[in-house]
């Protein structure tokens, strides 16, 4: 029965987990995807510029694995770009070895850190749009990880506004997005067929609002005003903790102990938050580092983080832990109810660093909602991302022509 439950969760959770990045091997941990050094933002890079996509991950051993990567060009809906030749979007080679790796040093959990960059001297992207990068062992067809990122050409102009004065309520529990796009030099014959849009909150897949019909169509652009489909729950600020040294508890950590094999970190019990209190957070982002902030990739150790949430037991659905670092098998982030303590608990192996996270209530249909005990407030500082895709007359693919990120505060 437990195996069946995990299978059901695995089917539902991909629509819940924030990151489009996935790991499929138990020993692969701490998948990081960052453009330049901006760890707070989604992986969106400019087509013509100096942006660099940095990808890194750990394999929990000192054994060498010959990992390779290949790129896949995708359409606006993340299906493969079947009508394009590889040479249309890629300059160079599309089956490359990850030859940059280092073993961990003096860690209780041994691991090997692998990393790569896009573009590099072997491959460079020629076209804007969506991309999926597959990582596997050389000679194997099975991915050990996949990474999704976007390349924007910024050839259209976006204007965005987020307000707590919504078409549902005013200054209560919701936030509403309004935005407009200017075509620029693009020739537009049928805007509703040639434009696709995505709006999301904190880069969470389960908040994506795709192709909402515009309110106004003009010769120069489109506008989305007073659209109920663009109203979002305010939610609450993400919770956070930071573990920089397993021998000393730091931000959000009650204590750290050694069980003879691993370090065990106990964040403070997550108590109900019925009133809003501003607390600067990272909206699900994470940053690997240690107390010396040096050689973070190979000196930072792993600890078991034991989450505890004070909440009544839910009869329907499940409670999951959510953050951009949550890339492993879905049941890793499923919380179990401990009736003896009246707590939901979960234990996750994580690398030293700063982590931003939230608890979500996942219903049986896979939809996610703020926990009643976490609160739902219009003041919450959320980040909204807007993407605009364009497909010109006679063109074979959707290009990402505009991207913007706006913070409500």
Would you name each region that the model predicts?
Residues 113-121, 218-231, 343-350:
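Exposed aromatic-hydrophobic patches
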Residues 89-114, 205-212, 304-352, 362-392:
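Aromatic-rich carbohydrate-binding modules that target alpha-glucans
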Residues 76-78, 122-123, 137-144, 204, ...:
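Short acidic/polar inter-strand loop motif in beta-rich domains
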Residues 26-75, 170-181, 292-307:
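Contiguous beta-strand segments within globular domains
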Residues 265-315, 400-409:
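Basic K/R-rich, polyanion-interacting modules in nucleoproteins and related proteins
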Residues 1-21:
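Bacterial Sec-dependent N-terminal signal peptides
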Residues 108-138:
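Ligand-binding face of N-terminal immunoglobulin V-set domains in extracellular IgSF glycoproteins
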Residues 23, 151-174, 377-402:
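Low-complexity, Pro/Ser/Thr- and charge-rich linker/hinge segments at domain boundaries
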């Amino acid at each position: 029965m437990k195996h069946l439950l995990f299978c059901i969760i695995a089917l539902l959770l991909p629509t819940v987990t924030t990151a489009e990045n996935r790991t499929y091997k138990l020993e692969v941990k701490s998948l990081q995807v960052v453009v330049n050094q901006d760890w707070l933002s989604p992986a969106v890079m400019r087509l013509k510029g100096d942006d660099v996509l940095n990808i890194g991950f750990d394999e929990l051993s000192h054994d060498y694995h010959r990992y390779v990567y290949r790129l896949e060009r995708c359409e606006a809906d993340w299906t493969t770009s079947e009508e394009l030749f590889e040479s249309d979007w890629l300059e160079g080679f599309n089956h490359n070895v990850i030859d940059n790796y280092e073993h961990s040093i003096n860690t209780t959990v041994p691991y090997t850190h692998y990393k790569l960059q896009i573009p590099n001297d072997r491959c460079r992207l020629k076209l804007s749009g969506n991309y999926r990068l597959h990582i596997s062992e050389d000679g194997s067809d099975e991915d050990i990880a996949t990474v999704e990122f976007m390349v924007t050409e910024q050839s259209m102009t976006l204007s965005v506004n987020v307000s707590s004065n919504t078409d549902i309520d005013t200054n209560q529990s919701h936030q509403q997005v309004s935005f407009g796009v200017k075509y620029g030099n693009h020739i537009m014959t049928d805007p509703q067929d040639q434009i696709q849009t995505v709006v999301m909150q904190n880069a969470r897949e389960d908040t994506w609002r795709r192709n909402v019909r515009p309110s106004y169509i003009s010769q120069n652009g489109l506008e989305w005003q007073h659209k109920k489909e663009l109203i979002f729950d305010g939610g609450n600020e993400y919770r956070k903790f930071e573990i920089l040294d397993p021998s000393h508890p730091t931000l959000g950590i009650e204590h750290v102990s050694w069980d003879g094999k691993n370090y065990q970190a106990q964040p403070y019990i997550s108590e109900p938050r019925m009133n809003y209190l501003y607390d600067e957070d990272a909206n699900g982002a994470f940053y690997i580092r240690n107390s010396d902030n040096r050689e973070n990739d190979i000196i930072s150790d792993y600890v078991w983080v034991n989450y505890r949430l004070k909440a009544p037991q839910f009869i329907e659905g499940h409670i999951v832990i959510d953050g951009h670092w949550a890339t492993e098998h879905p049941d890793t982030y499923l919380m179990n109810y401990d009736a003896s303590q009246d707590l939901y608990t979960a234990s996750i192996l994580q690398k030293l660093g700063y982590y931003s996270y939230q608890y979500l209530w996942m219903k049986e249909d896979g939809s996610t909602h703020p926990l009643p005990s976490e609160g739902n407030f219009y003041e919450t500082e959320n980040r909204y991302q807007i993407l605009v895709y364009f497909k010109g007359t006679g063109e074979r693919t959707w290009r990402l022509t505009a991207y913007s990120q706006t913070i409500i505060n």
